[in-house]
Structure formats: structure tokens, C-alpha cells
A protein has these predicted regions:
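Contiguous terminal or domain-adjacent regions
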Residues: 158-194
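Charge-rich, low-complexity amphipathic helices
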Residues: 49-52, 117, 174-178
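Cysteine protease-like catalytic core of ubiquitin/ubiquitin-like
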Residues: 65-168
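Cysteine protease catalytic domains with a Cys-His-Asp triad
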Residues: 1-93, 99-104
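Residues that form generic nucleotide/phosphate-binding pockets
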Residues: 25-29, 121-124, 128, 189, ...
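Alpha-helical structural motif
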Residues: 22, 117-121, 182
């Protein structure tokens, strides 16, 4: 079982998840799944050069699919915030790359249109795959699942966990409504709220 991540009782059960909250959960899954790697959470403008030629999020800016394959990483989860690095943050979305299934999956719990930044990253991965003889299918969800305001981070975590299990396709995952209450229950399990 994953270590519970209780916040000394200070965090409310429906408070918006921070990047640190998401990172702590995903790093535990990384430790338990040697074929999985997590990147992020990253601001949407991951490839903007900020200083000395460095990008906002170097792992994404310098992403190299071949290096992941060499390290036997076949599943990669990425969480993005839809705000740029110089803003507070507004909404979490996720991308999952399954090299064995040859799929790149984009999940937004609101079912909104994909950002040009994430689309550009997915195209970059697709081109790298083609050079390695891997034809990726890029699929985006269009269905809205979230109707409350605080659970987008939990939806991202849940999406990555479910895709990592590899028991259902992306289409199967997104076809049935995933209610906010399910995310609240998962939050209580992962973060041990009273």
C-alpha cells in the first residue's frame, strides 16, 4: 500500500492539490513500478527558455524517447498545469505515453481542447517514435468528467494510475463518467484525510 500523505491535518479534504502533493504520490508509484517514470508537474510553457538557455521544465524540453526505452521505461506519465510558469496555476491536465501499446493519451477532466504546448510535445514524441520505428496513436478525451472545482489534480493522478495498470484502453477509461465523488474517495485513501 502507498504511504499515506497526510498534511498534519492542515489541508482540507477538497483543497486544490499542489504540485508537491501530486509529485509525492507519483514518485511512490515510480518506486513501485520500474517500467514507469513520472515527469512534472510542469507549467504549460515547459519549453520556454528562461535563463542561461534552460527551459522551464528541462525533462520535457529535452525529452528523448530512445533514452527511456534504453532504460526499459515503457510508461511515462506527465502532469501539466494550464498556466505558464509565472502564474499561480489554474487547472491540472495529464498526458500518458504507453510505448508498448504505441499510444499517447491526453486527459483533461473538463474535456477541454488541448493546449498548443501539449500538442507540440505529443508531436515531438510521435516524431521521435517514428525515427525508432514506433507509430504512436495520439488520442485526446473530449468528455467532461469533472463538475466541481477542486479535483482536477486527483483526476490526473487517477488517470495515470489506471493507465499504468494497463488493464483497460484509453477509450474504455474515458467512456464511462468518472464522478467527482470517486475522486474525493481516492483523495481520502491517498492522503489519509480524517
Amino acid at each position: 500500500m502507498l504511504q499515506n500523505l497526510r498534511k498534519n491535518g492542515k489541508k482540507k479534504p477538497n483543497e486544490w492539490l499542489t504540485s508537491v502533493d501530486i509529485l509525492k504520490v507519483m514518485k511512490q508509484f515510480e518506486k513501485k513500478n520500474t517500467d514507469f517514470e513520472f515527469i512534472g508537474p510542469s507549467p504549460i510553457d515547459y519549453d520556454k527558455h528562461i535563463s542561461y538557455g534552460e527551459c522551464v521544465w528541462e525533462e520535457l524540453c529535452k525529452f528523448n524517447l530512445e533514452n527511456y526505452i534504453k532504460r526499459r521505461i515503457t510508461k511515462i506519465g506527465v502532469v501539466f498545469n494550464t498556466d505558464p510558469h509565472d502564474q499561480e496555476g489554474s487547472h491540472w491536465v495529464a498526458l500518458f505515453i504507453n510505448i508498448k501499446r504505441r499510444g499517447i493519451y491526453y486527459f483533461d477532466s473538463y474535456g477541454e481542447r488541448i493546449s498548443k504546448f501539449i500538442n507540440r510535445f505529443a508531436k515531438k514524441v510521435t516524431k521521435q517514435g517514428q525515427r525508432l520505428g514506433i507509430e504512436f496513436e495520439f488520442i485526446k478525451n473530449k468528455r467532461r468528467h469533472q463538475y466541481k472545482t477542486s479535483e482536477c489534480g486527483m483526476y490526473c493522478i487517477y488517470f495515470i494510475i489506471e493507465m499504468m495498470k494497463d488493464k483497460q484502453t484509453f477509450q474504455e477509461f474515458t467512456q464511462t463518467l468518472i464522478p467527482d465523488d470517486k475522486m474525493l474517495k481516492l483523495r481520502r485513501q491517498l492522503f489519509n484525510y480524517m
